[in-house]
Amino acid sequence: MKIHRLAGYIQNIYLVEYPTKLLLLDGCCRADVDTVYQFITEHLNRPMTDLKLIVVTHMHPDHAGGAYPLRKLSGAKIAASNAPGQWYQGLDGLLMHLTDMALAWWVAGRLGKKRQNLWYNRHLTPDYYLATDAQLPYFEEWQAIHSPGHTDRDICLYHSASESIYIADLLVKVKGELMPPFPIFYPRRYLNSLLMLKTLQPKKIMFAHSDEMNLAEINFATILDAVPETPMTHWRSVKAKARRALGFKRSSLRR
């Protein structure tokens, strides 16, 4: 087994290579489809049909956006959490889907990337639904570990033989420091997911938005202190900013 890390549009892409098959640890962005295609067919000199499984760790644009196009190109199967329903369901879900793509463009701008088409289907119908601790189809040495909090359906992917784990957005790096991601819809579940990682004691941790680390490099005490007690979501953020702006305006009028 060899794990290749590719530079994606706004995140790392992890492609696991075996002699007869390939595993994509996350669904990446729609803008990353050509990157994955070229790496497999040109760098590895392998047919796209060697890609057997694409895991979608959660439904955000940089983790699910390329799943359907890559399945169409390769015939690979898609696996995702067995969380009920769709993450982006209803009118609120549609608005959140649009907001998340706008946030992805904002991140791209901060990274100096040109704006690219990130549109993808907000509803996912995977070929396999993964229960917690389930083995991945075709790749039994990999295990799906549910790690909700960021959303209700986040999963990490653990390779027990090498004691390596891909944690997607469980932690992100901002200004050189690891911290909880935005948003966090379920703070208590998120706290439990962090404790799971700490208890598991992996030797290598792979991030979507940071370089690889070992467990000793992570200051869990600081991170655990930063976990919010209430949900930290798009709408709460907008409301809080509106209240602050309104309060400032009223204060200025009183002067």
Spans of model-derived segments:
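Residue-level marker for buried hydrophobic side chains located in beta-strands
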Residues: L23-L25, V55, I78, S164-Y166, ...
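Anionic-ligand binding region
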Residues: P126, A131-A134, A144
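Short, charged, surface-exposed secondary-structure boundary motifs
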Residues: W87-D92, K175-P180, K239-A240
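Metallo-beta-lactamase
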Residues: C28-A31, E141-T222, V227
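Conserved beta-strand hairpin/beta-sheet module of binuclear metal-dependent hydrolase folds
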Residues: M1-H43, C156-V172
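Binuclear metal-ion centers of metallo-dependent hydrolases, dominated by the metallo-beta-lactamase
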Residues: E212-R255
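Short N-terminal helix/helix-N-cap motif within the alpha/beta-hydrolase-1
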Residues: V33, M59, A64-G66, D152, ...
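Active-site HxH/HxHxD metal-binding segment of metal-dependent hydrolases
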Residues: T41-D127, T230-M232
